[in-house]
């Protein structure tokens, strides 16, 4: 599974309240959530992401309260994948279950810059950027099967058919 796109870069400790503020949690429409993704940190995020982007971030991306809407908002906004130095565990699983690939890469914010175009091999974790190949942690097994299906619901439909 290959994912490619230009980079939007953010720092450490981007929590779910930044990814999708609590005032929007009463809504379930992915298109609505997308318009408010990352709004407190980057009011232009939706416009930038709508072209299809890869987020690069620092440590503990997705920390804070567990909200599936965070993964839904990012994916619906046009985020193709997230590369970070580390992820909050429940956020990581929410993203996999919603079909959004996450790659852990030590020193991601030092290795990749805003505007770079990255090509990610989700299975191996290899990230090609500016002629260099970086080695992140790939996704394998059932998590990869879920991603390839487009999310947990699609995966369950496929395996129960």
From Swiss-Prot:
<dbReference type="GO" id="GO:0003861">
    <property type="term" value="F:3-isopropylmalate dehydratase activity"/>
</dbReference>
<dbReference type="InterPro" id="IPR000573">
    <property type="entry name" value="AconitaseA/IPMdHydase_ssu_swvl"/>
</dbReference>
<dbReference type="InterPro" id="IPR011827">
    <property type="entry name" value="LeuD_type2/HacB/DmdB"/>
</dbReference>
<keyword id="KW-0456">Lyase</keyword>
<comment type="function">
    <text>Catalyzes the isomerization between 2-isopropylmalate and 3-isopropylmalate, via the formation of 2-isopropylmaleate.</text>
</comment>
<dbReference type="InterPro" id="IPR050075">
    <property type="entry name" value="LeuD"/>
</dbReference>
<dbReference type="GO" id="GO:0009098">
    <property type="term" value="P:L-leucine biosynthetic process"/>
</dbReference>
<keyword id="KW-0028">Amino-acid biosynthesis</keyword>
<keyword id="KW-0432">Leucine biosynthesis</keyword>
<dbReference type="Pfam" id="PF00694">
    <property type="entry name" value="Aconitase_C"/>
</dbReference>
<dbReference type="InterPro" id="IPR033940">
    <property type="entry name" value="IPMI_Swivel"/>
</dbReference>
<comment type="pathway">
    <text>Amino-acid biosynthesis; L-leucine biosynthesis; L-leucine from 3-methyl-2-oxobutanoate: step 2/4.</text>
</comment>
<comment type="similarity">
    <text>Belongs to the LeuD family. LeuD type 2 subfamily.</text>
</comment>
<comment type="subunit">
    <text>Heterodimer of LeuC and LeuD.</text>
</comment>
<keyword id="KW-0100">Branched-chain amino acid biosynthesis</keyword>
<dbReference type="InterPro" id="IPR015928">
    <property type="entry name" value="Aconitase/3IPM_dehydase_swvl"/>
</dbReference>
<protein>
    <recommendedName>
        <fullName>3-isopropylmalate dehydratase small subunit</fullName>
        <ecNumber>4.2.1.33</ecNumber>
    </recommendedName>
</protein>
